Regions:
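Glycan-recognition and catalytic cores of secretory/periplasmic carbohydrate-active enzymes
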Residues: 1-184
């Protein structure tokens, strides 16, 4: 991880960062995780500057239910937990997650990546606040994705693997007649 961050970090300085969706969110998840075990100030500063540049917000605002938009919230929460002096750091992501928590809808995660993009946010808020509602909603969203999304859920219990989304669950098969699974 260190070699990757050291190699790419300078290549992003001075560039406009127009996106606060999953494509950059997952990079910053990794960078802040690296910072937690290898605390170089430039890793923290670069991550903080990115979050601040986006005003600690998400693409499509606080009413988004889209996990791709919410992914950046994982990093915002991590930064806040390192220095919990400014509640504005998590205000937007909390508003978005609270909106989801306070509705009965559970079919938001209709592609497998959504579990990685949004699920940790619910766990982080559950731990931070001590409120069970975050864990309950996380479980409801996860269970629906696993067991119901598409025809019969996106998880193949027999093979222990996940289909990408409902377009790839049975009866879909690859040209070789096998199931098509998703991985990164």
């Amino acid at each position: 991880m260190k070699k990757y961050a050291d190699y790419t970090l300078p290549s992003f300085f001075g560039r406009v960062r127009p996106s606060n969706i999953w494509t950059r969110g997952v990079y910053y998840e990794g960078l802040i995780a690296l910072y937690s075990i290898y605390p170089r100030e430039d890793y923290y500063s670069y991550t903080y500057d990115w979050a601040n540049f986006h005003k600690w917000g998400m693409r499509n605002g606080n009413t988004t239910r889209n996990a791709d938009d919410q992914c950046c919230g994982q990093v915002y929460i991590d930064l806040y937990n390192m220095c919990p002096s400014d509640p504005n750091m998590i205000r937007n992501i909390k508003a978005s997650i609270d909106m989801v928590v306070n509705t009965p809808q559970v079919n938001d995660w209709d592609w497998i990546d959504a579990i990685q993009m949004a699920m940790p946010i619910y766990a982080k808020f559950g731990k931070m606040t001590g409120e069970q509602k975050y864990y309950d909603k996380m479980w409801d969203l996860y269970s629906y994705t696993r067991n119901t999304e598409g025809e019969a859920g996106m998880y193949n219990a027999k093979e222990g693997l996940w289909w990408r989304d409902q377009d790839f669950d049975p009866p879909y098969k690859e040209p070789n007649g096998k199931n098509c699974y998703w991985s990164r």
